[in-house]
């Protein structure tokens, strides 16, 4: 019996999972690692610690599954996207910490490039908004702030990679320096139409071509693990960024299919097929995966604060002891009692992109209780996801959503999922396996080696846990949305004219 090992390198922890042919989890391990905050709005990770934690959980997951390395058919890698590492080609030693996707230190670089009108070129070629979220300006910052780095980069002495590339390089012990199209599409350096690193983009961001990894499909054999690591040479056969792997793991393989991941934030992706659609409504167009000589594109919208609003009620206001208690408290009242909660703790993401918005709880009366506020907080997650899907309808011609597939921690909340179905007026479907990110990477690897035969087989493995059908009267829904939009209006631009944030 053979298995697939999935490496899931996330923002706060490194995980590994072993799957069998029926997509059942046979072994699992997870290890958290250090978050480094050198100054406000800066976020870093130690790449060596990431690799060490990842190596540890791979061995642990195999032990938990009671299998030997030679029983692994292939390895798939999925990762936190955009996070940037630069290391020495000869020694494999990082020249600086990894700069994490959440890091805002390059915001001023982005502002300057916008003043020069570069954001329009970047949007047309990459499908991305010009923002410090993506890798391009992070690379620029490291090369300009680490002594001698730019010269060494131009001499071909350094390697750049997103986290997938860093893990691959270490698994193969310096033999493979490559990335997949999905991760590359989040760097600001890949032309998503030609599928090549783009000279004009490299020139705008002042990034030397010599440091870039080779571009490959997401489902192909990248190389093998070095025998010294596990005592076996295991093919590494699948790579995709986390939200793209989750889209694949949800079997959203046809154009028009959509998934939403309800984690700390929410990430909503819609498969838009084989042709990119560039959104002028501040949604992101990316490559979800490349396989069989073609790529699939997605449109993505992200909500900064999703499940994190419930953590805040738990830790900041001490409304309940466990996040899972939120559902019972919110269900103890029949509606939000006129209370609306806009959780713009760090501004608003898509489709507003307002970094000056701040959190707002509005409509409170003497009769409001913590149950109403908790219900309003849960509803805010669904309202924000509704706003993204509504914007997607404007960007995608003839787009009518049939069902929304859901995963992530907060997808276990039945009240929230029912409210989401009511707002969207479509089915919300939760699968049996909600570890869709790791599963997607496993599928991509297994398809490359023939462990799974076809996309149809992947679709057949996807199983429903629960379907939520819309049941709210239209006039009630419209009233809720009208009030939500009023509340968002109050939260927007809150600190625009003040000096504090």
Curated annotation (Swiss-Prot):
Amino-acid positions noted as binding ATP in the UniProt annotation, renumbered to this chain: 11-13, 264, 307, 311, 409
Key word Cell membrane present: no
Regulation: Inhibited by fructose 1,6-bisphosphate (FBP).
GO molecular function: ATP binding; glycerol kinase activity
Entry-linked Pfam families: FGGY_C, FGGY_N
GO aspect biological process, one term: glycerol-3-phosphate metabolic process
Stated name of the protein: Glycerol kinase
């Amino acid at each position: 019996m053979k298995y697939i090992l999935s490496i899931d390198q996330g923002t706060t922890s490194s995980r590994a999972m072993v799957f069998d042919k029926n997509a059942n989890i046979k072994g699992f391990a997870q290890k958290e690692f250090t978050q480094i905050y050198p100054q406000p709005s800066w976020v870093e990770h130690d790449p060596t610690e990431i690799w060490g934690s990842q190596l540890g959980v791979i061995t642990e997951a195999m032990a938990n599954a009671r299998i030997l390395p030679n029983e692994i058919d292939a390895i798939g890698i999925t990762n936190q996207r955009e996070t940037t590492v630069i290391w020495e080609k000869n020694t494999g030693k990082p020249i600086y910490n990894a700069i994490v996707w959440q890091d805002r230190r390059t915001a001023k670089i982005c502002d300057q490039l916008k003043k020069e009108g570069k954001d329009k070129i970047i949007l047309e070629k990459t499908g991305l908004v010009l923002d410090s979220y993506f890798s391009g300006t992070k690379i620029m910052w490291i090369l300009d702030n680490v002594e001698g780095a730019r010269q060494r980069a131009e001499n071909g002495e350094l390697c750049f990679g997103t986290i997938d590339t860093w893990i691959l390089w270490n698994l193969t012990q310096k033999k493979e320096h490559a990335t997949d199209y999905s991760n590359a599409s989040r760097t600001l350096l890949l032309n998503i139409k030609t599928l090549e690193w783009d000279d004009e983009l490299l020139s705008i961001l002042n990034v030397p071509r010599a440091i870039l990894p080779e571009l490959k499909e997401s489902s192909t054999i990248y190389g093998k693990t070095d025998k010294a690591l596990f005592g076996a040479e295991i093919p590494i056969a699948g790579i995709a960024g986390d939200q793209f792997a989750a889209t694949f793991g949800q079997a959203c393989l046809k154009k028009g299919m959509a998934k939403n991941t309800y984690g700390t934030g929410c990430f909503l992706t819609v498969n838009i097929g084989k042709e990119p659609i560039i959104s002028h409504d501040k949604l992101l167009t990316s490559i979800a995966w490349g396989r069989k000589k073609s790529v699939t594109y997605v449109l993505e919208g992200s909500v900064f604060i999703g499940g994190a609003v419930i953590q805040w009620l738990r830790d900041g206001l001490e409304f309940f002891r466990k996040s899972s208690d939120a559902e019972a408290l919110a269900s103890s009242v029949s509606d939000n009692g006129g209370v609306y909660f806009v959780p713009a703790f760090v501004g608003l993401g898509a489709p507003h992109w307002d970094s000056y918005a701040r959190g707002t709880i509005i409509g409170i009366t003497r009769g409001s209780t913590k149950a109403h506020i908790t219900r309003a907080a849960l509803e805010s997650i669904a309202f924000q996801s509704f706003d993204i899907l509504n914007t997607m309808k404007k960007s995608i011609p003839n787009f009518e959503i049939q069902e929304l597939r859901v995963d992530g921690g907060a997808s276990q909340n039945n009240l929230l999922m029912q409210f989401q179905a009511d707002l969207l007026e479509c089915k919300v479907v939760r699968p049996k396996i909600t570890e869709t990110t790791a599963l997607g990477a496993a599928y991509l690897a297994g398809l490359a080696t023939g462990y799974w035969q076809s996309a149809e087989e992947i679709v057949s493995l996807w199983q429903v846990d629960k379907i939520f059908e819309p049941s709210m009267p239209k006039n009630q829904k419209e009233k809720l949305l009208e009030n939500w939009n009023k509340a968002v209006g109050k939260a927007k631009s809150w600190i625009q004219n003040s000096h504090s944030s």
